[in-house]
Every structure is written in structure tokens, then in C-alpha cells.
Amino acid sequence: MSRVTIAIALCLVHTGCEAVSGGAVELSWKLRPASSDLPDKFVDCASGLDGTNPVTRVRLFWDVDGQQGTASWRCDDNHGVTGFDLPEGSALLSIAPECAEGPASTSTYTAPPAEKRRVISGDTVSLGAVEMILRVSYCGQQPCICE
């Protein structure tokens, strides 16, 4: 091999790769109404229904062997990927909707139970598509999402 070839190969190795020290999480989400009498079986982040306000963000929570963290994305993105921020280890991963004023009241939605996954440095854990069920009807009789 010539010196030029070796030099080019070394440049590519040093500039083309970035060291990572943790794992990442990828997920997508859909919002469903708690009441099945609505004609549409999915709702937008801003449902436009009386007594509700928009879900502005979706937050991912993690606890990896006692080390906790979060990441959030705009609800309308319908998809999110963290950086390689999670430490290696056994992770509990959960999600929750957020309103403009802060976290949504837990009485106004149902999120999937926390999932246990193994985080490996340099790898991405996929939660796949998750659904959150939101209270968006009968808001005069019960609390609704982000009211």
C-alpha cells in the first residue's frame, strides 16, 4: 500500500466515525380516544374537542440501573430518537404526554406499561409504535387531557 492510500484510510477512519458512550432509543406514537363512540379511532395532538387542549410533547423516561433521564419531542412529530445518551445496562422505558403547562394529569390518559430493555453502547433500542389512550370526551363529567 502506498503512503497516500494509508493516509486517506486513516483520515476516513478518524473523521468518519464518532465515539459513542451509550445507547439510544427510538419510538413512534399514536393517540387514541378513550371513548369508542368517536368515529375516528385516532386523535391528533390538538384534538379540537371541547374541554381539551393540545398535547404538545411526548416524553420518554428511562431508568438504567438507577440512572434516570428523559428526552421529549413535539407531539406532532409522531416519532423520536434519542442521542446515544443512555448508559449501558437494564433499562425501564416509559412514555407520557405533556401539555403546554407541563405533564398531563395521569387521570386523563393511559400509557403503555414501562418496558424493560437491555441498552448496549452504540446500539439503538426500538420501542416500536406505542399508543396512548386520551380522555377527550365527556369532559364536563370527567377530567380530559390537558384541560
Report each predicted region and the residues it spans:
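N-terminal Sec signal peptide cleavage junction
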Residues: 17-20
